[in-house]
Each structure stands twice: as C-alpha cells, then as structure tokens.
Amino acid sequence: MAAWEWLSKPAPLVAPTLLGMVLVRQFADGLQVRAQIVETEAYTAGDPACHAYRRKTRRNQVMFGPPGHLYVYRIYGLYHCLNIVTEAEGIASAVLIRAAQLDCLPEWIPANKRLKPARVAAGPGLLCQALRIDGSHNGWRLEPVAAGQEGIWLEGSPAWEAQFPIVQTTRIGITRGVELPWRWYIKGHPAVSHY
C-alpha cells in the first residue's frame, strides 16, 4: 500500500485506524517528541459540524486535499486544533486528533502539568500546546524530514485490527451533527479527553 493510500479514504474510515499510531513532532534543534494517538474525531463535507460544510474558503481550503496534509485552525481565539486531511483531493475530509500520550515532557511543559503527564495532551488544544503546533503548520505534509529540519509525521501501521479496546461514540464540543458516532478513543486510556 502506498504511503498515503490508506489516508485517501473518508475520515470516518481513517479516524479509528489512527488510534495507537504515533505522531512525531521534530524541531529544528533535533528534538523529537512522540505522541501516541488515543482519541480521534471524523469530519466530512456533508457533515454540518465540518468547517467545509457550506463551501470552500480560504480558511478551510487545506481540508480539500490532497490527503496526508495538516489542517490546523484556531478555536475560541486561543487554542489550535490539529487535523489530518483524508479522502481524495477535492473532497473535504479530515480527522481531528483529539488526544495523545507523549513519550516525554519537553522543557516548556509547566511544572504543574508535569504532575499528571498523561493529561498534558488530553484534548485538542492541549495537544497542540504540548507539541507547539500552531497556524504556521497549516498545510504541512505529513512526512519525515532530515535532522535539523522541522517536521511532523506518523509512525506505525494503521490499526486495521486494533490491539486494544476501542470505543466509538458521538463527537463532543460541537453543536451540529452531534448525533453522528464519529468519535473513537482507546478505552480506559488516561490521556483521553474528559468532555
């Protein structure tokens, strides 16, 4: 299977397969922080909760592909959210990475958050803060980079046959499309978001 072939499917098919995979964030100084994905949500063009529900705009154009790129946006004017673009080019579809477990705590994580390391990236805004992902990463391709360069990519295989119990339920933190069961998380994992 080609590197991006499995990401060329609709977000509701891709989202559960990302569970257990590792998102790698490499910084220019060589530091790599790995985050095991523990919670995802799917958004597609026909979904009223999707940013591209009505039409393509400058803000959401990355959602229209190609797959394997990052769609990063700001919510509440404060926090960023990280999505992985899926499906064929021209079709708006993305998976929100809601929560992850970091393999290490970078120096910029405040002392009070270090007391509960599993909670450092337990929500989409917290995840972006922990990995220092912001709007400048919007449109980046998910691909490994050479030492001394910044990059974000995935490691591991898509979890077509999960090795841990997965819960499928409705999405949270939205007001439209709330009935769609397009949220997945690893059951009992301490890094899953609380709301």
Swiss-Prot record:
SUPFAM superfamilies for this protein: FMT C-terminal domain-like
Root EC class: hydrolase
GO terms under biological process: base-excision repair
GO molecular function: alkylbase DNA N-glycosylase activity; DNA binding
Key words of the record: DNA damage, DNA repair, Hydrolase
Position of the signal peptide: none
Domain of life according to the entry: Bacteria
Gene3D superfamilies xrefs: Methylpurine-DNA glycosylase (MPG) (3.10.300.10)
EC number(s) on file: 3.2.2.-
Family affiliation: Belongs to the DNA glycosylase MPG family.
Protein name (Swiss-Prot/TrEMBL): Putative 3-methyladenine DNA glycosylase
